[in-house]
């Protein structure tokens, strides 16, 4: 009886503990739903501002700071894709470690107090190799991607379930007390679904049903999918989404990808998006009824290893995002958007309460007003003209609206923010070069520290095989390597016309891309590259008898977008012919017996990660020769700034630091000369090629090396140089920030948005004038000089300011007095401070300062 009584007590205690656990979980769990205005969390509509950070494009050591900077910038949500190819590189062999530790990334966002939007896809596009699909998926029998195909649906459901179950196990959905408030299935399918016919409709319905069956307890969305079945929320992607409307009056207006810039391709100039236009797009979206928008990207990061897609997407995925590739703030973009977010949040009570009332204020001018029953009022005044500024009357008061701008009035009276008027300083950044040599010697002395191994030209591995005809590359390599050798031995008779004295043969090659090198009898004869198709005519010297033709085909990222992108293909598909340079008949080589080798000998022997006795250290170091592996050791650059390698002097290849692949390098890929301008007018619709820089220059010379991959000393750099270059020209560079600050603020600027309180009232009536604020970005810095200061009509931009026809003689001395020796300073932009240098014009204060 005594034992039985104890057992009853134990069971009662277990029940009590279980009840307590249920209560605790219930107390922390959130109920996430939606209505026509917004996502609803625990019964309250939310205005949400989100930003994309892709966890594999940075390192776990970088994640906390990236997430904190996102929060400091005014974000509520971190949005990320889930990268199937990284998590399941081989079928049923999973990877959730290192840069692919998705659980850790989501938990860090939660720790910072941010929500998460998990875009499972599992097709992601993202300029990621093969759109995020693992290439083994291509070889599943009977499979057809992204359509009503049973093998594909089975694999898609299996992986999606794997991710959802993992999130559930870690209690990461909001319904479990976690940060995930929204999940996405599929991705931009509506852009290309017409190519799949009727099967696309049934596939989308199946995708929605499958996702809902996983019972996450939070809503699901489909982006760019106008026929997304209920209860899926269809969302918008693009540079502008103010005109977007969801496919049901019961769904909120949501923007899952607001492209903050654009991606860079090898051979292309660098695109950028002016922050005035980006802010305009955001303000217009909230003006027109939106309540959730996401920056794609907020931090772009780096395409480490062989993850870049395209083809020909660069290793840098900087994207001109508010936080740059290296994790530093891009100013004034980050700061201007932070101020925008504060202004929008001042309007939240009114925004979520009702739909806007939109009225015309004139041609290309409009007002949107949100009012609550309790009397809260917020207004957005827009001028969508691309050239002309305007003065409008609203509620009996005049407001100046620059062209292509929106003013936000959290109380329907006072302007808290205008998208075209920046109150955040431009902060200069620069790379400081450091030699690889431990004692700081010149890079010219580095040859003695380098060792090398020559990669054999042509067939060198035991697993090479013979096949008649030309094989498509992806089907042959399964993307295990960028490299595929096509080798042919052909006999040339002595009476061939191209053996005549002074005559050459022409080797004609056609390839699907992306790079081809042609070796004749062991010597490089020519090469070419192209995104989709390569056609080469290479003059070559042949000999009577047996000649060896070795063609090395190289991929630079697999296609990631478009209908049937998985079938695009790569490699040498022919025709391949020999003919005389003088004309005449040609010899067909394509149909002959070719020997194939997948990958390089150096890859098989692990030269990037495993020490080898084959490394040669003797001088002279062979340079400007193709197909050479190089290795050196180096000390980590001093300081804590982000690190890059400048590959200027090399050709093309792949590099590793301490066994970690930093990606493909290609500093000899030069952008064309057309399309770049000294400045870019933010006014008017943005497009990917509107604002370009670095024309006529290498697309990318600097390649990110995360600090966490480095040791203080004894670091190993290995590179495979395929094209031919001089590795002794390589240098390290650390990215410095904050030495120069520049800002121009006019009398027509609104006061700093920080002067507003959360109840939409100006907190300090003495601070209702515009203010120029400067702050050194590093806590140990102070402003030590004012290079330029002018209150009046200054001209120019940062680094080239000049005085205009009107200037207060007190400008420099007053700014120096207010700022020198301080980390931050505020200077009121008014005649009360500077006097009246000229009447009848709106005056500005322009300042360029230096931080110590």
From Swiss-Prot:
Domain SUEL-type lectin: 766-852
Active site as annotated: 188, 257
Annotated localization: Secreted, Extracellular space, Apoplast
Keyword tags: Apoplast, Glycoprotein, Glycosidase, Hydrolase, Secreted, Signal
Main enzyme class: hydrolase
GO molecular function, one term: beta-galactosidase activity
Major place of residence: secreted
Protein name per the record: Beta-galactosidase 8
Lineage, top ranks: Eukaryota, Viridiplantae, Streptophyta, Embryophyta, Tracheophyta
């Amino acid at each position: 009886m005594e034992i039985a009584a104890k057992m009853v007590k134990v069971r009662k205690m277990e029940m009590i503990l279980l009840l307590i656990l249920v209560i605790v979980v219930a107390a922390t769990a959130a109920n996430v739903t939606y209505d026509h205005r917004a996502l609803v969390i625990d019964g309250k509509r939310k205005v949400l501002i989100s930003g994309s950070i892709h966890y594999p494009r940075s390192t776990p050591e970088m994640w906390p700071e990236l997430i904190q900077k996102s929060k400091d910038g005014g974000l509520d949500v971190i949005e990320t894709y889930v990268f199937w190819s990284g998590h399941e590189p081989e079928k049923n062999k999973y990877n959730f470690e290192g840069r692919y530790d998705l659980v850790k990334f989501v938990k860090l966002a939660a720790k910072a107090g941010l929500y998460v939007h998990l875009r499972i896809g599992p097709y992601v596009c993202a300029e990621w190799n093969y759109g995020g699909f693992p290439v083994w998926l291509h070889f599943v029998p009977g499979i057809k991607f992204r359509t009503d195909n049973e093998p594909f649906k089975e694999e898609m459901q299996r992986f999606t379930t794997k991710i959802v179950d993992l999130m559930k196990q870690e209690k990461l959905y909001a319904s479990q007390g976690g940060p995930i408030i929204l999940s996405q299935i599929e991705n931009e399918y509506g852009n290309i679904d017409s190519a799949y016919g009727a099967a696309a409709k049934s596939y989308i319905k199946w995708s929605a049903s499958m996702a809902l069956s996983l019972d996450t307890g939070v809503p699901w969305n489909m982006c760019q999918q106008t026929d997304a079945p209920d209860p899926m929320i269809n969302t918008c992607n693009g540079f502008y989404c103010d005109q977007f409307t969801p496919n049901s009056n019961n769904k909120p207006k949501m923007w899952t990808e607001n492209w903050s810039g654009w991606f860079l391709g090898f051979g292309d100039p660098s695109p950028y998006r002016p922050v005035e236009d980006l802010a305009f797009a955001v303000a217009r979206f909230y003006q027109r009824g939106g309540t959730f928008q996401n920056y794609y990207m907020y931090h772009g990061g780096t395409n480490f290893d062989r993850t870049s897609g395209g083809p020909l997407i660069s290793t840098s995925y900087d994207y001109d995002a508010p936080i740059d590739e290296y994790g530093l703030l891009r100013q004034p973009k980050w700061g201007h958007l932070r101020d925008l977010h504060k202004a929008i949040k001042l309007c939240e009570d009114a925004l979520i309460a009702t739909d806007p009332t939109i009225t015309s204020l004139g041609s290309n001018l409009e007002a949107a007003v949100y009012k609550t029953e309790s009397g809260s009022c917020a207004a957005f005044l827009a001028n969508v003209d691309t050239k002309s500024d305007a003065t409008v009357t609203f509620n009996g008061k005049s407001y100046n609206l620059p062209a292509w701008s929106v003013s936000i009035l959290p109380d329907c009276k006072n302007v808290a923010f205008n998208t075209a008027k920046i109150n955040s300083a431009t902060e200069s950044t620069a790379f400081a070069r450091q030699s690889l040599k431990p004692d700081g010697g010149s890079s010219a002395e580095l040859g003695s520290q380098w060792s090398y191994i020559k990669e054999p030209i042509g067939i060198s591995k035991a697993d090479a095989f013979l096949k008649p005809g030309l094989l498509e590359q992806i089907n042959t390599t399964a993307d295990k390597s960028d490299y595929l050798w096509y080798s042919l031995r052909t006999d040339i008779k002595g009476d061939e016309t191209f053996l005549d004295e002074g005559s050459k043969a022409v080797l004609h090659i056609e390839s699907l891309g992306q790079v081809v090198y042609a070796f004749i009898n062991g010597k490089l004869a020519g090469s070419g590259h192209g995104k989709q198709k390569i056609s080469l005519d290479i003059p070559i010297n042949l000999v009577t008898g047996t000649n060896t033709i070795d063609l090395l085909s190289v991929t630079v990222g697999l296609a990631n977008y478009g209908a049937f992108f998985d079938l695009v293909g790569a490699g040498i598909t022919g025709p391949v012919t020999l003919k005389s340079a003088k004309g005449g008949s040609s010899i067909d080589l394509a149909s002959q017996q070719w020997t194939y080798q997948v990958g390089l000998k150096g890859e098989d022997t692990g030269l990037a990660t495993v020490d080898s006795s084959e490394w040669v250290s003797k001088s002279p170091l062979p340079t400007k020769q193709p197909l050479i592996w190089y290795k050196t050791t180096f000390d980590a650059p001093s300081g804590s700034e982000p690190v890059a390698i400048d590959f200027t002097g090399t050709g093309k290849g792949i590099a590793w630091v301490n066994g970690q692949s930093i990606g493909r390098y290609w500093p000899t890929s030069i952008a064309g000369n057309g399309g770049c301008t000294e400045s870019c007018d933010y006014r008017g619709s943005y497009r990917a090629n509107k604002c370009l820089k670095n024309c006529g220059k290498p697309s990318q010379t600097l390649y990110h090396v995360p600090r966490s991959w480095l040791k203080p000393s004894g670091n190993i750099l290995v590179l495979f140089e395929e094209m031919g270059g001089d590795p002794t020209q390589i240098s390290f560079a650390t990215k410095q920030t904050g030495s120069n600050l520049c800002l121009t603020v006019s009398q027509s600027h609104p006061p700093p948005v920080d002067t507003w309180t959360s109840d939409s009232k100006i907190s300090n009536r003495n601070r209702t004038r515009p203010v120029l604020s400067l702050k050194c970005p590093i806590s140990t810095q102070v402003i030590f000089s004012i290079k330029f200061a002018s209150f009046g009509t200054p001209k120019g931009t940062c680094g080239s300011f000049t005085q205009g026809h009107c200037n207060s003689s007190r400008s420099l001395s007053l700014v120096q007095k207010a700022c020198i020796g301080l980390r931050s300073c505020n200077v009121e932009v008014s005649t009360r401070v500077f006097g009246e240098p000229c009447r009848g014009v709106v005056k500005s204060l322009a300042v360029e300062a230096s931080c110590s």
